Protein backbone atom coordinates (compact mmCIF):
# COMPACT_ATOMS: atom_id res chain seq x y z
CA UNK A 1 0.00 0.00 0.00
CA UNK A 2 1.20 3.51 -0.83
CA UNK A 3 2.82 5.19 2.17
CA UNK A 4 1.49 8.59 1.13
CA UNK A 5 -1.29 10.55 2.80
CA UNK A 6 -3.55 13.52 2.12
CA UNK A 7 -4.47 15.54 5.22
CA UNK A 8 -7.62 17.67 5.32
CA UNK A 9 -6.01 20.80 6.71
CA UNK A 10 -7.72 23.97 7.96
CA UNK A 11 -4.86 25.49 9.92
CA UNK A 12 -6.71 24.85 13.19
CA UNK A 13 -5.59 22.97 16.30
CA UNK A 14 -7.07 19.61 15.38
CA UNK A 15 -6.00 19.45 11.74
CA UNK A 16 -2.50 20.72 12.57
CA UNK A 17 -2.14 18.04 15.24
CA UNK A 18 -3.24 15.51 12.63
CA UNK A 19 -0.71 16.94 10.19
CA UNK A 20 2.12 16.29 12.65
CA UNK A 21 0.67 12.82 13.30
CA UNK A 22 0.71 12.10 9.57
CA UNK A 23 4.28 13.33 9.20
CA UNK A 24 5.31 10.67 11.71
CA UNK A 25 3.20 7.92 10.15
CA UNK A 26 3.80 8.38 6.42
CA UNK A 27 6.74 8.94 4.08
CA UNK A 28 4.98 11.67 2.10
CA UNK A 29 2.23 14.04 3.23
CA UNK A 30 0.08 16.37 1.14
CA UNK A 31 -2.19 18.97 2.75
CA UNK A 32 -5.48 20.13 1.25
CA UNK A 33 -7.39 23.21 2.42
CA UNK A 34 -10.90 24.13 1.32
CA UNK A 35 -11.98 27.68 0.58
CA UNK A 36 -15.73 27.76 1.22
CA UNK A 37 -15.92 31.54 1.63
CA UNK A 38 -15.41 31.31 5.36
CA UNK A 39 -15.60 34.73 7.03
CA UNK A 40 -12.05 34.65 8.29
CA UNK A 41 -9.55 34.39 5.44
CA UNK A 42 -6.91 34.17 8.14
CA UNK A 43 -7.80 30.47 8.39
CA UNK A 44 -6.47 29.85 4.87
CA UNK A 45 -3.47 32.10 5.53
CA UNK A 46 -2.61 30.05 8.64
CA UNK A 47 -2.84 26.78 6.73
CA UNK A 48 -0.70 28.14 3.90
CA UNK A 49 1.92 29.50 6.29
CA UNK A 50 2.19 26.26 8.28
CA UNK A 51 2.40 24.09 5.17
CA UNK A 52 5.10 26.33 3.71
CA UNK A 53 7.07 26.34 6.95
CA UNK A 54 6.95 22.54 7.12
CA UNK A 55 7.80 22.15 3.43
CA UNK A 56 4.60 20.26 2.63
CA UNK A 57 2.83 20.18 -0.73
CA UNK A 58 -0.34 22.20 -0.22
CA UNK A 59 -3.48 22.53 -2.32
CA UNK A 60 -6.32 25.03 -1.82
CA UNK A 61 -9.58 23.96 -3.44
CA UNK A 62 -12.48 26.29 -4.19
CA UNK A 63 -15.64 25.10 -2.43
CA UNK A 64 -17.57 28.36 -2.58
CA UNK A 65 -20.71 26.54 -3.69
CA UNK A 66 -21.02 25.21 -0.13
CA UNK A 67 -21.76 28.72 1.10
CA UNK A 68 -24.46 29.09 -1.55
CA UNK A 69 -26.16 25.86 -0.50
CA UNK A 70 -25.73 25.91 3.28
CA UNK A 71 -25.69 29.37 4.91
CA UNK A 72 -24.15 29.21 8.39
CA UNK A 73 -22.46 31.28 11.08
CA UNK A 74 -18.98 30.50 9.75
CA UNK A 75 -19.68 32.12 6.38
CA UNK A 76 -22.38 34.73 7.04
CA UNK A 77 -22.04 37.83 9.22
CA UNK A 78 -25.80 38.02 9.66
CA UNK A 79 -26.03 34.61 11.36
CA UNK A 80 -25.27 34.58 15.08
CA UNK A 81 -22.93 31.97 16.53
CA UNK A 82 -24.97 29.97 19.01
CA UNK A 83 -25.30 26.46 20.38
CA UNK A 84 -28.07 24.15 19.25
CA UNK A 85 -31.29 24.23 21.23
CA UNK A 86 -33.96 21.56 21.71
CA UNK A 87 -32.06 19.03 19.65
CA UNK A 88 -31.19 21.41 16.81
CA UNK A 89 -27.66 21.71 15.42
CA UNK A 90 -25.38 24.65 16.33
CA UNK A 91 -25.41 27.58 13.88
CA UNK A 92 -21.76 26.79 13.12
CA UNK A 93 -22.66 23.46 11.52
CA UNK A 94 -22.05 23.50 7.76
CA UNK A 95 -24.34 21.00 6.04
CA UNK A 96 -22.38 18.38 4.12
CA UNK A 97 -18.99 19.93 4.80
CA UNK A 98 -17.04 16.88 5.94
CA UNK A 99 -18.70 14.66 3.35
CA UNK A 100 -17.69 17.03 0.54
CA UNK A 101 -14.23 17.74 1.92
CA UNK A 102 -13.38 14.06 2.32
CA UNK A 103 -14.76 13.25 -1.12
CA UNK A 104 -12.60 15.87 -2.79
CA UNK A 105 -9.64 14.87 -0.63
CA UNK A 106 -10.21 11.35 -1.97
CA UNK A 107 -10.14 12.58 -5.57
CA UNK A 108 -6.88 14.42 -4.90
CA UNK A 109 -5.44 11.40 -3.09
CA UNK A 110 -6.16 9.07 -5.99
CA UNK A 111 -4.68 11.51 -8.51
CA UNK A 112 -1.57 11.77 -6.33
CA UNK A 113 -1.32 8.02 -5.79
CA UNK A 114 -2.08 8.25 -2.07
CA UNK A 115 -4.12 5.60 -0.28
CA UNK A 116 -4.44 7.37 3.05
CA UNK A 117 -6.71 10.28 3.99
CA UNK A 118 -6.38 11.95 7.39
CA UNK A 119 -9.03 14.12 9.04
CA UNK A 120 -9.27 15.70 12.49
CA UNK A 121 -12.92 14.95 13.20
CA UNK A 122 -13.69 13.90 16.76
CA UNK A 123 -16.77 12.28 18.23
CA UNK A 124 -15.81 13.07 21.83
CA UNK A 125 -16.08 16.84 21.31
CA UNK A 126 -18.25 16.75 18.21
CA UNK A 127 -20.74 19.39 19.42
CA UNK A 128 -23.63 17.51 17.86
CA UNK A 129 -22.18 17.57 14.34
CA UNK A 130 -23.43 14.38 12.63
CA UNK A 131 -20.55 14.34 10.14
CA UNK A 132 -17.98 14.03 12.95
CA UNK A 133 -19.26 10.62 14.03
CA UNK A 134 -17.18 7.48 13.62
CA UNK A 135 -20.07 5.66 11.93
CA UNK A 136 -20.22 8.38 9.25
CA UNK A 137 -16.48 8.21 8.58
CA UNK A 138 -16.54 4.41 8.26
CA UNK A 139 -19.54 4.61 5.94
CA UNK A 140 -17.93 7.26 3.76
CA UNK A 141 -14.70 5.26 3.60
CA UNK A 142 -16.61 2.35 2.09
CA UNK A 143 -18.47 4.66 -0.28
CA UNK A 144 -15.26 6.30 -1.51
CA UNK A 145 -13.69 2.91 -2.13
CA UNK A 146 -16.69 1.78 -4.15
CA UNK A 147 -17.11 5.06 -6.02
CA UNK A 148 -13.48 5.24 -7.17
CA UNK A 149 -12.61 1.52 -7.12
CA UNK A 150 -9.67 2.33 -4.88
CA UNK A 151 -8.62 1.11 -1.44
CA UNK A 152 -8.60 4.29 0.62
CA UNK A 153 -8.02 4.22 4.36
CA UNK A 154 -9.53 7.20 6.21
CA UNK A 155 -7.67 7.90 9.45
CA UNK A 156 -9.16 9.82 12.39
CA UNK A 157 -6.40 10.12 15.02
CA UNK A 158 -8.54 12.30 17.29
CA UNK A 159 -11.82 10.40 17.04
CA UNK A 160 -11.95 9.04 20.59
CA UNK A 161 -9.94 11.62 22.51
CA UNK A 162 -10.98 14.93 24.07
CA UNK A 163 -9.29 18.32 23.75
CA UNK A 164 -6.99 17.72 26.72
CA UNK A 165 -5.73 14.52 25.10
CA UNK A 166 -5.33 16.34 21.80
CA UNK A 167 -3.05 18.82 23.54
CA UNK A 168 -1.16 15.88 25.05
CA UNK A 169 -0.66 14.45 21.57
CA UNK A 170 0.74 17.79 20.41
CA UNK A 171 3.05 17.86 23.42
CA UNK A 172 4.20 14.30 22.74
CA UNK A 173 5.21 15.49 19.26
CA UNK A 174 7.07 18.42 20.84
CA UNK A 175 4.66 20.81 19.12
CA UNK A 176 2.39 22.11 21.87
CA UNK A 177 3.69 25.69 21.77
CA UNK A 178 3.79 25.67 17.98
CA UNK A 179 0.15 24.62 17.75
CA UNK A 180 -0.91 26.97 20.53
CA UNK A 181 0.71 30.00 18.88
CA UNK A 182 0.28 29.39 15.15
CA UNK A 183 -3.11 27.76 14.65
CA UNK A 184 -6.54 29.33 14.29
CA UNK A 185 -9.54 27.83 16.07
CA UNK A 186 -11.38 31.01 17.03
CA UNK A 187 -14.72 31.75 15.34
CA UNK A 188 -13.75 35.43 15.42
CA UNK A 189 -10.58 34.83 13.42
CA UNK A 190 -8.00 35.49 16.16
CA UNK A 191 -4.88 33.32 15.87
CA UNK A 192 -3.42 31.53 18.88
CA UNK A 193 -5.41 31.63 22.11
CA UNK A 194 -8.21 33.45 20.27
CA UNK A 195 -10.98 35.58 21.74
CA UNK A 196 -11.55 33.26 24.70
CA UNK A 197 -15.30 33.71 24.40
CA UNK A 198 -16.62 31.76 21.41
CA UNK A 199 -17.49 28.04 21.79
CA UNK A 200 -14.37 26.94 19.88
CA UNK A 201 -12.05 29.04 22.06
CA UNK A 202 -13.68 27.83 25.27
CA UNK A 203 -13.33 24.19 24.22
CA UNK A 204 -9.71 24.74 23.24
CA UNK A 205 -8.83 26.63 26.46
CA UNK A 206 -10.61 24.19 28.74
CA UNK A 207 -8.75 21.33 27.11
CA UNK A 208 -5.41 23.09 27.46
CA UNK A 209 -6.04 24.00 31.09
CA UNK A 210 -7.05 20.42 31.88
CA UNK A 211 -3.94 19.02 30.20
CA UNK A 212 -1.52 21.48 31.82
CA UNK A 213 -3.08 20.77 35.21
CA UNK A 214 -2.66 17.02 34.66
CA UNK A 215 1.05 17.54 33.97
CA UNK A 216 1.48 18.97 37.46
CA UNK A 217 0.13 15.82 39.12
From Swiss-Prot:
<feature type="binding site">
    <location>
        <begin position="9"/>
        <end position="19"/>
    </location>
    <ligand>
        <name>ATP</name>
    </ligand>
</feature>
<keyword id="KW-0067">ATP-binding</keyword>
<dbReference type="GO" id="GO:0008270">
    <property type="term" value="F:zinc ion binding"/>
</dbReference>
<comment type="function">
    <text>Catalyzes the ATP-dependent conversion of 7-carboxy-7-deazaguanine (CDG) to 7-cyano-7-deazaguanine (preQ(0)).</text>
</comment>
<dbReference type="InterPro" id="IPR018317">
    <property type="entry name" value="QueC"/>
</dbReference>
<comment type="pathway">
    <text>Purine metabolism; 7-cyano-7-deazaguanine biosynthesis.</text>
</comment>
<feature type="binding site">
    <location>
        <position position="201"/>
    </location>
    <ligand>
        <name>Zn(2+)</name>
    </ligand>
</feature>
<comment type="similarity">
    <text>Belongs to the QueC family.</text>
</comment>
<protein>
    <recommendedName>
        <fullName>7-cyano-7-deazaguanine synthase</fullName>
        <ecNumber>6.3.4.20</ecNumber>
    </recommendedName>
</protein>
<feature type="binding site">
    <location>
        <position position="195"/>
    </location>
    <ligand>
        <name>Zn(2+)</name>
    </ligand>
</feature>
<dbReference type="Pfam" id="PF06508">
    <property type="entry name" value="QueC"/>
</dbReference>
<keyword id="KW-0862">Zinc</keyword>
<keyword id="KW-0547">Nucleotide-binding</keyword>
<dbReference type="GO" id="GO:0008616">
    <property type="term" value="P:queuosine biosynthetic process"/>
</dbReference>
<keyword id="KW-0479">Metal-binding</keyword>
<feature type="binding site">
    <location>
        <position position="186"/>
    </location>
    <ligand>
        <name>Zn(2+)</name>
    </ligand>
</feature>
<keyword id="KW-0671">Queuosine biosynthesis</keyword>
<feature type="binding site">
    <location>
        <position position="198"/>
    </location>
    <ligand>
        <name>Zn(2+)</name>
    </ligand>
</feature>
<comment type="subunit">
    <text>Homodimer.</text>
</comment>
<dbReference type="GO" id="GO:0005524">
    <property type="term" value="F:ATP binding"/>
</dbReference>
<dbReference type="GO" id="GO:0016879">
    <property type="term" value="F:ligase activity, forming carbon-nitrogen bonds"/>
</dbReference>
<dbReference type="InterPro" id="IPR014729">
    <property type="entry name" value="Rossmann-like_a/b/a_fold"/>
</dbReference>
<keyword id="KW-0436">Ligase</keyword>
Amino acid sequence: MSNKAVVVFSGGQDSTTCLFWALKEFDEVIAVTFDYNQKHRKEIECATSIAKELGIEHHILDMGLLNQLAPNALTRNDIEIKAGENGSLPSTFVEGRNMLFLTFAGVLAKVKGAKHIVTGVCETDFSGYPDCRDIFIKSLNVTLNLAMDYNFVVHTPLMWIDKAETWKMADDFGKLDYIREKTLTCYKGIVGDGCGECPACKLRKNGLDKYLESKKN
